[in-house]
Amino acid sequence: MQVVDDTLKAEDAYRLATRGTTMLWSGDYHNARQLLSALGRRIPGARPAKRSAGQKAEPGPDVGADFYRHRQARSRRSRLLASILVPLAPGPAVDLRRAPDIAQAWTHAHGRLPEAAVVPLQDLLGVLGADQWRIRGVSVPALQDTIHPHYGAFAPVRGEYLDLVAEQPLPETTTAFDIGTGTGVIAAILARRGINHVIATDLSDRAIACAGENLARLGVGDIVELEQTDMFPAGRRAGLVVCNPPWLPGSANTLLDQAVYDPKSRMLRAFLTGLLAHLEPGGEGWLVISDLAEQLGLRSRDELLGWIADAGLRVAGRRDVKPTHRRAVDPDDPFHSARSAEITSLWRLTPA
């Protein structure tokens, strides 16, 4: 570790970072932020390459391999940015000039800090950004209300999959499960639609706490029962079981990665293989998932259909919607062709 200050130039910081040297900042907080931004601009692959007018970003012929290389580049970028450290005093407080008050954001994310520590500046900025999401909330048209994600919980900024859940006709049932509830947004939609009893599960204690606060604030806390467990409530059945698993197979390296990447499709396959044992007679499962993995060559449609059949299930229906989020229409995205072709679907699954 090397102690550095405002005199450190970005090119020198990049050289130190690529050599594996961590830099403990002792200068001005805002100058540290500027240095972090400058360091990010120097990392190869940090920004899309400039193209001539009308030229689109296109991956190579093996889009799946391109995507994994892209993830590796982003992982390297994250490691290099994490080399800039800032000191924290107990509480915590950032022990630098012109530093913001971080006590509320840090305590909400990690609890009180009993002794001095050092943390990557980019991690601290992530904590502060997440706290703003928690305070302001995310507008969810399907609820006509807001959801307030906690640190480590995925913000439901894409509304199309929630619209599918809100608009699909409900089966005749009084009980539903929401598997992997996260912020509680799907459980809230089901409760608002008139399901008498919703059991929402998640393995993460952060998610359970986040969902509990959201459901109470939305006035459905007495309808939704939260259970911290892996996948299904043990020994229970419902007429409707909903699951919105992470959409891409791949390793999850951060808390937020866990909402996007499903290692070896574990959660998707666990939902399919366990669904029959947790459906009431006449019940159905709703699998809410994007086909982006198929567009990227990470999974085939035949694989998904094979897993459904192997689980003793059949597809009773499917409702599709085309995403309209920013990255779906961004020609500078390195995977624009895949993202622009993406479809999000609600698969209705019943016993075969």
State each model region's role.
Residues 102-175, 179-181, 185-189:
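SAM-dependent Rossmann-like transferase core, predominantly class I methyltransferases
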Residues 158-243, 249:
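Conserved SAM/SAH cofactor-binding pocket of Class I
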Residues 304-351:
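Class I S-adenosyl-L-methionine
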Residues 282-289:
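Conserved beta-strand signature within the Rossmann-like core of class I S-adenosyl-L-methionine
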Residues 267-281:
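A short glycine-rich, Lys/Arg-flanked "PGG" loop and its adjoining helix->strand segment in the class I
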Residues 245-270:
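Mobile active-site "lid"/loop adjacent to the S-adenosyl-L-methionine
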Residues 1-138:
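N-terminal auxiliary segments of SAM/dcSAM-dependent transferases
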Residues 270-271, 296-312:
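Short alpha-helix
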